[in-house]
Amino acid sequence: MPESKPDPSVFPPTAPPPRLVASGLYLVATPIGNLRDMTLRALDVLAAADLVLAEDTRVTAKLLSAYGLKAKLERCDDHASARAAEGAIERLRAGEVVALVSDAGTPMVNDPGFVVARAVIAAGLPVHPIPGPSSLLAALCIAGLPADRVLFAGFLPAKSGARRAALEEVRTARQTLVFF
């Protein structure tokens, strides 16, 4: 049988290859202690990203290096999230792929990245979750407690008075409680 050639009208020789990852903001979960917990889809998104927003660029640079990936990194911590949101929206409007990662686990869980996601959603641009490691779910799995009703209370305040008040708020809760 003769070898078939691709139809040049579909993919002309000068056309760029099709993108495997569509433009959008991708909330990419990262490992929480074992680099082998990274998902293949997360690696695909990070490889395709025009920009990776990171809580700590040094931590994310090590992660990318472990997988042989290179990406433009920008800081997205408590002090830079508003500026990162503006830059992300500009890039997304230009058709680029922007990934948002936290230092460990799933972005948006006690993480300043929510400022970026909220702004992108408000701008009517696409946001895609890339699931993976989650310390919240890992804690529930090993606790041996019912997980059908759960209250996640995040980090308790550092000051004792505020911490007592936060615990008092949930003292009568009938759900399994999870704190960081």
Language-model features: locations:
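Beta-strand/loop-alpha-helix module characteristic of Rossmann-like adenine-cofactor folds
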Residues: 2-15, 22-23, 134, 138-180
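Glycine-rich, flexible N-terminal cofactor/catalytic loop recognition
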Residues: 2-78
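Loop/turn-to-beta-strand initiation segments
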Residues: 23-25, 94-99, 175-176
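Short glycine-rich anion-binding loops that position phosphate/pyrophosphate groups of nucleotides
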Residues: 32-35, 103-107, 158
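Short active-site oxyanion
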Residues: 46-52, 124-128, 177
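Conserved helicase motor
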Residues: 75-83, 156-160
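Short phosphate-binding loop-to-helix
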Residues: 79-93, 112
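Short glycine-cluster motifs
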Residues: 93-153
